Curated annotation (Swiss-Prot):
Gene3D superfamilies in UniProt: dsDNA mimic, putative
Gene name of the record: yciU
HAMAP family registered for this protein in UniProt: Put_dsDNA_mimic
Annotated InterPro entries: dsDNA_mimic_put, Put_dsDNA_mimic_sf
Species whose genome carries this gene: Salmonella typhimurium (strain LT2 / SGSC1412 / ATCC 700720)
Protein family: Belongs to the putative dsDNA mimic protein family.
Superkingdom of source: Bacteria
Protein role: May act as a double-stranded DNA (dsDNA) mimic. Probably regulates the activity of a dsDNA-binding protein.
Protein name: Putative double-stranded DNA mimic protein YciU
């Protein structure tokens, strides 16, 4: 898979794309109670944070996760407005190279 460093989503574009995918698929993958909780609390405590892919993704996929091209976006709620997300609703793995659309999601169980 040939990828171009100059053809990547920015960090903001990556966060936005992951959040859009989350919103589109949440109803099919989360409990209704979780969706209500997320929607009620997101304004005050919700967020999406960008990370290099965690090592445990290798249990779910079978290719190299070069952090130059792949990012993990954690979507959920924090205890405080500026706190770290500790109530995770989804972990979204995205390829940031614009010509390689790839997305995997680990949903809250």
């Amino acid at each position: 898979m040939e990828m171009d460093l100059n053809n990547r989503l920015t960090e903001d574009e990556t966060l936005e794309q992951a959040y859009d995918i989350f919103l589109e698929l949440a109803a099919d993958n989360l409990d209704p109670a979780d969706i209500i909780l997320f929607n009620l609390q997101f304004e005050e405590r919700g967020g999406a944070e960008l990370f290099d892919p965690a090592e445990d993704w290798q249990e779910h996929i079978d290719f190299d996760l070069n952090p130059d091209f792949f990012a993990e976006v954690v979507i959920g709620l924090a205890d405080t407005e500026d706190g770290e997300i500790n109530d995770i609703f989804a972990r979204v793995l995205l390829c940031r190279e614009k010509d390689h659309k790839l997305c995997h999601i680990l949903w809250r169980e």
